[in-house]
Amino acid sequence: MGSTAISTQQAFCSLQKFTPLSYASSCRSLRSRRKWAVPARCCSPATDVATAAKENRRELLKNGDDKLEICRVLNGMWQTSGGWGRIDRNDAVEAMLNYADDGLSTFDMADHYGPAEDLYGIFINRVRRERPPELLETVRGLTKWVPPPVKMTRSFVSESIDVSRRRMDVAALDMLQFHWWDYSNPGYLDALKHLTDLKGEGKIKTIALTNFDTERLRIILENGIPVVSNQVQHSIVDMRPQQKMAELCQLTGVKLITYGTVMGGLLSEKFLDTNLTIPFAGPALNTPSLQKYKRMVDAWGGWSLFQELLRTLKTVANKHGVSIPTVAVRFILDQPAVAGSMIGVRLGLSQHIKDANAVFSLVLDVEDISNILQVTNKGRDLQKVIGDCGDEYRRA
């Protein structure tokens, strides 16, 4: 392992007072996560950055014989569900092709994200017809199933999954991420057992979760459900997954896929040096994601502390010649158990391909990590304020 990787490992181990994991657990994790070693091959800088970026681009999720390789920066398609601007179907599919052509070939969606699954079906057919087989082999479509609290019969689960398969025009879903609203209803175990059977029939390649807490993840694994990942909210502001959840994931091999990593765009230059207390003085919080994550900022420490964080991130970004969102994503990708982080895409309206691809070659050093953690340590512990992962969706 080269000097950069060693210094980064030492930084995280020496800064444990800023992180929830124990010294031993965190250091074990860093030793086991080979990606730390990738950027340290410094004998030929230009070649090395390209090699590091290529090797750091994809991650294998697995549980037993179930495997799925994804791009570590995922294209989140919540923004197709309304509230972010009108989506033109043709423009959206062209944008998806652009992302895939530039190596950003994993798309995350849900059954309730408006036309997201339908757009993926059109997109994947374009890939089949117009792109080489090598690109098709790297494209991944991850969807979610968020059922109502009804009895989870085999026929109901199977019919629901068939809807997504038809919309996405695939014989087997690459990944089905399951969400459940009410833990007092144990039907989630029935649903997951039926999903496991459907996986055995070849209708699903991998089973995963979204917004499950640590206790329920443990129960699910104890029931023999082959979960490969749990999708949770995780950002520099919201470090809850690095408490109980990451420790269980490290023990079991389950990975984390994170969303809210750039906080709907709040973690960007656009909101640097702005004062939202003055009406119309700053950028409008005019999307569901901006409004959601502004509430998270308020719970964490308020706008003044958030501005201090943005200024610190801007200093780090300038040092490396990247943007604030790139730093924000890289920081979370380097956390234990994190396999991939999501950036929401406004297909056909704006794009972030350059910033997203810059994540793969960015290496945060000891000084960067220390400066960021000195600010975040001033914020409230959101585990105490909100609860464990996903608890924000289950409180009255």
Regions found by a protein language model. Give the residues of each.
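N-terminal binding-site loop/beta-alpha segment at the start of enzyme catalytic domains
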Residues: 2-139
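Beta/alpha (TIM)-barrel catalytic core signal, keyed to glycine-rich beta->alpha loops juxtaposed to Asp/Glu
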Residues: 57-60, 181-383, 391-396
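Active-site mouth loops of central-metabolism enzymes
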Residues: 78-90, 145-156, 180-186
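Short, acidic/polar
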Residues: 86-100, 152-169, 190, 213-219
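A structural motif
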Residues: 101-104, 170-173, 204, 227, ...
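Short beta-strand segments at enzyme active-site cores
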Residues: 106-111, 173-177, 208-209, 326-328
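A short, structured active-site edge motif that brings together acidic residues
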Residues: 135-149, 176-178
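Active-site groove signature of glycoside hydrolases
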Residues: 165-187
